[in-house]
Amino acid sequence: MKIANNTVVTEFILLGLTQSQDIQLLVFVLILIFYLIILPGNFLIIFTIRSDPGLTAPLYLFLGNLAFLDASYSFIVAPRMLVDFLSEKKVISYRGCITQLFFLHFLGGGEGLLLVVMAFDRYIAICRPLHCSTVMNPRACYAMMLALWLGGFVHSIIQVVLILRLPFCGPNQLDNFFCDVRQVIKLACTDMFVVELLMVFNSGLMTLLCFLGLLASYAVILCHVRRAASEGKNKAMSTCTTRVIIILLMFGPAIFIYICPFRALPADKMVSLFHTVIFPLMNPMIYTLRNQEVKTSMKRLLSRHVVCQVDFIIRN
């Protein structure tokens, strides 16, 4: 344990996902393959939406931002986790821990708010189609984007300020593979009851409200679609049902992690792995690859790239 002369902890030791070498190797290989396949897919989504002038509807602005948020989010935990699998001593500095914690909550909070905005966009498009062009105009869309980024920033700053005010005088072992509020506050050498209540209010309540708001929005949309007699009824119901499943998969672990910070549970690490590494990589792919316009544009983009490569090879 490394502690400075003033008894302030300057680094944390990450105990990792598991102590079993065989399981570590298996998880390392799976996450590396998963990361190398799906992460480029997120950047392809961003590039496709940015390069196609036909994808200008608010939905595509939100899908592009979702891919950017999740690609950025995956950079916070996964690369370091992969490096730590190969290291005997898994150490992160105090400043590095605070930085990781800040970006986790900045991007995670922003993404939760973005999903709420996307649900509102679908509600307007399906239930109030005549008002879509006036309500979801470019100015309103960019204002919503600014608001969700600011919301994520404020949420994260509150978390960081609460952590920075805590004294850490040892021990310095975090029973996880990354730095997060739930594990860090357990190491503070002071009474944590009030701080944990504030954490529940900031993270847990925000997560729960986003979750309930999303479920309510899609419940209203599904009820409206069921009563409608349009050609796209089945497609709209399928899309909404898929998004509800995604919301359950995303917010279930988040609620599990942040609504009950007072006790450690056996499933904590696996839930954290799913929440911080696996789902952020899958999320934009699931949302976007159900959109026919994006898939068509992506195929055209890849076809042009292949043609250019073949032409370059022939000329040289």
From Swiss-Prot:
One of its GO terms (cellular component) is plasma membrane. InterPro entries: GPCR_Rhodpsn, GPCR_Rhodpsn_7TM, Olfact_rcpt, Olfactory_Receptors. The chain crosses the membrane at residues 27-47, 57-77, 100-120, 144-164, 205-225, 244-264, 269-289. It is found in: Membrane. Residues 1-26, 78-99, 165-204, 265-268 are cytoplasmic. Keywords: Disulfide bond, G-protein coupled receptor, Membrane, Olfaction, Receptor, Sensory transduction, Transducer, Transmembrane, Transmembrane helix. One of its GO terms (molecular function) is G protein-coupled receptor activity. It comes from the Eukaryota. Residues 48-56, 121-143, 226-243, 290-316 are extracellular. Gene3D superfamilies: Rhodopsin 7-helix transmembrane proteins. The keyword Membrane applies. Disulfide bonds join C97-C179. It is a multi-pass membrane protein. Odorant receptor. Belongs to the G-protein coupled receptor 1 family. This is Olfactory receptor 4N4C. It comes from Homo sapiens.
